[in-house]
Regions:
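Hydrophobic core
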Residues: 11-15, 19
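A periodicity- and composition-biased signal for non-globular, repetitive helical segments
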Residues: 10-11, 473
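Surface-exposed repetitive/solenoidal architectures
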Residues: 29-473
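Sec-dependent signal peptide recognition
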Residues: 4-9
Length: 473
């Protein structure tokens, strides 16, 4: 009996011992297959060799220091050789946390389509557009990207030309957990009409951004007095959707002219996060200082937009659970016909559960401004609050919650609101309430009027707000 039990035990032991290594071998085989599919990149020469297999899968096996001015997969016309270059990367590159160091140029990849970039760190980049391609921009990783995916990308260094920190032009791309630490100091280029920079990417109406951060300081300076556009954004220009993104860098535009005219059909936009969204802006915030200066001129038709989160109004855009904690300011002159809009959070087709605690400061010599603690032009504004100081010196309207308001309810203001000047008006809730107003159940603690001005005296259609002794939040 004992021998039978021993035989059974030995058989079971043999099965266990033979099956376990087989499983381990299968796992090792899987890793071997993966390694065979992905090509290791260990040098600058290996990066260049990627152009021989555009749809390959690659990974960084070590840190790489770039010694030359690389621009892989170019797509441009060389006027010297009269050759049209059309190349595009369509594969994948996994940095595996390794670094690409000291890149200098217009963009490591010129063109990418349906490609995947992940876990890449680029340090000490120096971005500048060459004169022959001045009409284009610059970016650290990709110049032109179409239907690409970018995740866990971090770039640090500096930029001297218009462009973006990580990717310049995009079409239907997705960005997740990307971080820019690029400090950009952009000087106006007179031969191009648009001078701009975005921390992550320029973006488009089909691109999405999630959990991205800009930590770089971006400054654009110029002396424009003709048709021109100055734009600086912490994350992106245009997006389809943006969620849980944060800007902590300082965003600055300075325009100074010497001939007595500060801007003719001239536009300046500075924003902590994005210019425009075709969909939702959710859970985004700004803690950086946002500042625009347009001075030393005597006449202007300059259009000014300055905000902490989003710059442009779009009816399809909903802004939810966003905040501004940084100082937002404008100094100088703006347009009479196209007023300046300055606010803590910004604009949107609707805005809910947003707040501002930063200082909103406007000092104008000429032109009209609408200044709001939370929203520049309030439509469908609900459950928002302002606790920051809102001050206007010059001509225009300043409101604790909104500079201009047409529909808003259940909002409150505890911040101080002031307007100084012959034609300056302040309201604890709104600077100005429009004719189509549906404004009710708003509250404030200040001693001023609920609004600086309203376009109708017909009592049933006046905005409704209530002064209270205190608000707990």
């Amino acid at each position: 009996m004992f021998m039978k039990k021993m035989a059974a035990f030995l058989m079971a032991f043999t099965l266990v011992c033979t099956s376990s290594p087989a499983d381990l071998h299968t796992s090792a085989a899987t890793e071997t297959v993966y390694a065979a599919q992905a090509v290791a990149i260990s040098s600058e020469e290996d990066l260049v060799a990627m152009q021989e297999n555009p749809d390959g899968n690659y990974y960084l096996a070590k840190d790489i220091t770039i010694k030359g001015n690389l621009n892989l997969f170019p797509n441009y016309y060389d006027y010297d050789t009269k050759v049209q270059h059309e190349e595009c990367f369509t594969g994948s590159l996994d940095g595996r946390g390794h670094k690409i160091k000291n890149y200098t140029g217009i963009g490591l990849f010129d063109n990418a389509k349906n490609a995947t970039f992940k876990n890449i760190v680029m340090t000490n980049v120096d971005l500048e557009t060459p004169e022959m391609r001045m009409a284009e921009g610059c970016a650290a990783l990709v110049l032109y990207a179409q239907k690409c995916s970018f995740s866990n990308i971090t770039v640090s260094g500096k930029a001297k030309s218009s462009g973006a920190g990580i990717v310049y032009a995009t079409e239907a791309c997705n960005f997740t957990k990307c971080i820019s630490k690029v400090d950009a100091n952009i000087k106006e280029q007179k031969d191009i009409s648009i001078n701009s920079f975005a921390g992550i990417a320029r973006g488009d109406n089909k691109s999405t951004f999630k959990s991205c951060k800009n930590k770089g300081n971006i400054t654009l300076t110029g002396k424009a007095n003709a048709e021109a556009l100055f734009m600086v954004f912490g994350i992106a220009g245009t997006v389809k959707k943006i969620e849980n993104c944060v800007n902590s860098g300082d965003i600055t535009i300075k325009n100074t002219v010497d001939d007595g005219y500060a801007g003719s059909d001239f536009e300046m936009k500075a924003c902590g996060l994005v210019e425009d969204s075709y969909g939702q802006v959710k859970g985004c915030g700004n803690t950086g200082k946002i500042s625009v200066t347009n001075k030393d001129g005597k006449m202007t038709r300059a259009s000014i937009t300055v905000s902490g989160v989003i710059a442009e109004y779009r009816s399809s855009c909903s802004v939810k659970q966003c905040y501004n904690k940084g100082t937002v300011s404008f100094t100088g002159i703006c347009s009479e016909s196209s007023p300046g809009y300055i606010s803590g959070v910004g604009a949107g087709g609707s805005m809910t559960e947003c707040y501002n605690t930063g200082k909103i400061i406007v000092n104008t010599k000429d032109g009209v401004s609408y200044v709001g603690g939370v929203m520049q032009y309030g439509t469908k504004l609900k459950n928002c609050y302002n606790a920051g100081t809102v001050s206007l010196t010059g001509k225009g309207y300043a409101g604790g919650v909104a500079g201009k308001l047409s529909a808003g309810s259940c909002n409150y203001n505890v911040g101080k609101v002031t307007a100084k000047g012959k034609n300056a008006y302040a309201g604890e809730i709104a600077g100005y309430v429009t004719m189509e107003s549906s404004v009710d159940n708003n509250y404030y603690t200040g001693s001023g009027k609920k609004s600086g001005g309203e376009c109708t005296s017909w009592v049933p259609y006046q905005s409704k707000a209530k002064k209270v002794s205190s608000i707990t939040f």
